[in-house]
Amino acid sequence: MSKKKKIILCCLAALVVVAAVAAVIVYSKLPHALNYPIDKIEPCAHQTVSVVSQDTDTVTLQKNDDGAFRILMFTDQHLNGDNKTGYKTVDRMVEAIQREQPDLVLVGGDNITSGMNRKRSAQFAEIFEQLGVYWGGVLGNHEGDNKYSITRTEMVGIFSSHAHCVMLPGPADIDGDCNYVIRLLDKDGNLVKTIFCLDTFDEISDETAASLTLYDKRTPYDGAHENQVQWYREKAEALKETDGNYESILLIHIPLHAYDEAIESEAFLYGDKREDICSTVYDNGLFDAIQDVGVTQIVFCGHDHLNNFGVQNKGVLLSYIEPSGYGAYGMDRRGAPESEWLQGYTRLDLLPDGVIAQDQIRYAEVFGD
């Protein structure tokens, strides 16, 4: 080999080394982890529930003491790696959980967003391990939508590998992740409430859109697919055989079109509509299934960060979870002072007589922001 070629090869090798080092440095500086002292989190005062059974699509939790079954719901936290907003989002959630001492936490999707999020996903689950609180929920439209993100299936796998996560992938023969049921029992083993969780994906493709009759919407948001709706019907009916005339809650991320229909004729029971409802753009039959089966009292969703209302539609309460994250658009984009921001959580107390006491709580009201 000539001296000239050796020099060229040495230069190329040096460039490769420099590029590799630069890539490592850049990667290390990118915001792919939660900058929060998770190991310093103080656990909740006592463990209030335990898992008594679990199979492919159903997990049962039993309360170990008397009193209402308390659930806290958070949604659209958008933990995208931004250190400042991520820290505040996690800190507020942790403070709320320690303050409220819930039996169960549910998340409504868009929890871990953006790319390079494997570590953030594990850290998110570790928060609940430190707190000693069981948690579950669904994914939103932004989990897995970044080309540098782990897949939705991988994320659910990371979550569910932790002891306090009751999130299940669900049946392998239907579409999506997080299609499952949580049954809640009181101290004596009586059923308190059943929670159905369904994946609503992100956006439909142009090809799929061309094959459907769409509502007049700007963004073609997806929803539960036909085989998921059929699973809901069959599972809900099957549970009547074991649980009798039970009542349930449905948790999804993208709202049903039934929300749009309801606000045309019904007054809000609480909250307000501050932006368009970005609901599923086609009729997937889920609300019809809810009507036909007759066990679901309330549907909770996330997705729209400026909506926090509840409204009745054909005897079913359609509600938003109070938006929780500081890492995405909110009232700040409209120039509102922080005292008017909506970030917070939804609290449910499932009372022994079957009544659900619900509160939409803003962090600004609790922590004085």
Label the model's feature ranges.
Residues N80-N83, T113-M116, G137-S149, E203-D206, ...:
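Active-site environment of divalent metal-dependent phosphoester hydrolases
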